[in-house]
């Protein structure tokens, strides 16, 4: 069944709009994060990434990393634009394993080297935006999202 994301359904929309994702494609942590993101006034937009279809990061292993969310916080200067995109992968505590360590390592390298390259040089659609990659665990997601929202 497809439906809008609310407190009783587990369906995702794009930043309060109407792109839908099937109920079984989201876990409880992702659902909680999505609901929380949707209530943040300082967010310009957020997007629930669709695994194996949308945005991905290619590390040194064969399989691509499809992060859970892309998030843009309003720029403090004008409140209309954004200067940074946050790439967020959420993980349950029971999923702290070798795969999670790999994703953290890939994201760490992305954070280290991304600032040295302008998106325009890569012909990417975000132009001159910064990008920050994060793996967030279920016991810290609220504080980490608050940090994202308040530190832009």
Protein language model regions, located:
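Electrostatic, structured charged patches in enzyme active sites and in nucleic-acid/phosphate-binding
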Residues: 1-152
């Amino acid at each position: 069944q497809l439906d809008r994301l609310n407190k009783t359904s587990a369906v995702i929309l794009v930043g309060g709009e109407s792109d839908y994702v099937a109920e079984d494609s989201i876990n409880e942590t992702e659902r909680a994060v999505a609901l929380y993101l949707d209530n943040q006034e300082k967010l310009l937009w957020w997007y629930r990434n669709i695994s194996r279809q949308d945005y991905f990061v290619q590390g040194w292993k064969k399989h691509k990393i499809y992060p859970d969310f892309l998030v843009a916080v309003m720029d403090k200067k004008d409140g209309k634009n954004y200067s940074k995109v946050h790439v967020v992968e959420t993980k349950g505590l029971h999923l702290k394993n070798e795969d999670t360590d790999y994703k953290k390592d890939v994201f760490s390298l992305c954070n280290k080297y991304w600032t040295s390259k302008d998106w325009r040089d890569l012909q990417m659609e975000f132009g001159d935006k910064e990008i920050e990659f994060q793996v967030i665990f279920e016991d810290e997601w609220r504080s980490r999202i608050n940090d994202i929202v308040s530190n832009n």
